[in-house]
Structures are given as C-alpha cells and as structure tokens.
Amino acid sequence: MNFRFFSIFVFILVFQTPSSMAELSIQITQGVDDPIPIAVVPFFMDSGSVLSEDVAQIVRNDLEQVGEFRALPLSNMISLPDEEQEVFYRDWRILAQDYLLIGKINQQPGSQLIRVQYEFFDVNREIKLAGEVLTGNVTQLRDIGHTISNVVFEQVTGVPGAFTSQLLYIVSENAGPNTSLFKLEKSDYDGARPQVLLESGEPIMSPSWSPNGQEVAYVSFETGLPRIYVQNIASGQRRQITNYPNINSSPVWSPDGTKLAMVLSKDGSPD
C-alpha cells in the first residue's frame, strides 16, 4: 500500500477537551454538478465474523467525500452480489448506476489475518475494470478500504487516488483561563485514527513530513523561542536541530530526505 503525506498549515481550534470531541472532521461542502453514480455493495463476510470496520462503507465514504461520486443507498439495491458470476448488469442499469464494486472478506477462525477480494465493473460497457486480493491484519481494514478507493478513483478519473494519504495538523485546545494546550497530530486523510505526536503548552508550527513519512520536522516554542525539531513518528524520539538567534522557522525536507531547508534570521534578516 502506498501512502502520501500532507501537512495542514493551520490551527484547528478545539475548545472541548475530551478526545472524542477533538477528532479532526473534514467535510466537502460542494462537489461536481453531476456526480458519478456508483453502487458499492456490502462486502460478504464468509466466516461469519463481525469486524471492527466496514470496508465497503469506508469506500463509499471516501468516494462521496471528494464530491465526484454519488453512492447508491443500500436500501435501493435489488441484489447483493459478491462475485462476478452473480452480477446482472441490467439490474444496475435499471438503477442508473455507471459503476459497481463488490467484494468478500475471509478471516480464519482464531486468526487476525484477513483476505479481501474485490471486483470493480463498468456497468454500461459490461466489463470488469479491476480486481485483486488484498491481505493483511484486521487492524489494516481501513488501509485496505482506502487502497480500494484509490483503485476505483483512478479507474474512473484517470487520476491517482489520494485516500491512503496521511495528514499532519496542529490543534489548539483551551486548557483553562488564559491557557492553551497545543498538539501536533497525524491522521488518515479523512480525519480518522488521529494520533498525538507532541503536546506542549507553547505553540507548535509548520509541521513537515519527511519524504519517506518516517519523520516530521516542526517549529516549537517550548524554550520560549522558535526552534526546529525533528521527531521519529514510530518511536517518538525527537531532537532539536537549530538554536540560532531570532527566527528559526519553516522547515522543508529535500526530496531525498537528507537535508532541511529553513528560514533563519541569525544575521539579522530572514534568509
């Protein structure tokens, strides 16, 4: 699975302190005038297990959130195929659907491993556009769903999907009278699975992903002055890399991830 990494250079102001209230919410308020109709059939679970994530619903949400697709409501579906021989194209043409996605999930009893098989069809041309088997741990169901969304999006639009992207953003919470708590967080592109990377009583600014997504550079005022830090995402280990007078800001990684460009004013004016 390929992941992309983006930084949001804004503060998200959160005044409720419970973590459930602080989750990042991303909403698309306007899409195209004539969204593409697509039917995403619930994926058949052949082992009878109940999973923590609904892969088909993740795909529906992904495609609708970008504003270019309109998913068929489940209540309008007249059949629920889970393999190609069960697909009757006329049924989906009657429902005015251009595309159809079906799938099935298998989990061995007592195992955390899953096997997700999906197939994607062009209803009007009556052909299968894509299909494959994805395997992973049950904790990767969201990643698998986003990966399928990428395939569907690219097959239809010709543009690579970005649903496996991750975001960096900064949250400012009201921690009491005249007191703020700043958090550097990362999440899926849709705000799901937020993870706090750093908490501070002083401002945090300008988060920047390393090209391989394993580290993040940012500006922290924890010493009372703006200083640039680099932090490993997995371990949480961090190191201060600048301590110049005045401005130390705006870190940006080189394409190979070995260097950082930044704005400094150690000689009196920003460079």
Label the model's feature ranges:
Residues 27-90, 101, 105:
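Short beta-strand->alpha-helix linker/helix-N-cap micro-motif
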Residues 24, 84-151:
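Amphipathic beta-strand/beta-sheet edge segments enriched in Tyr/Trp
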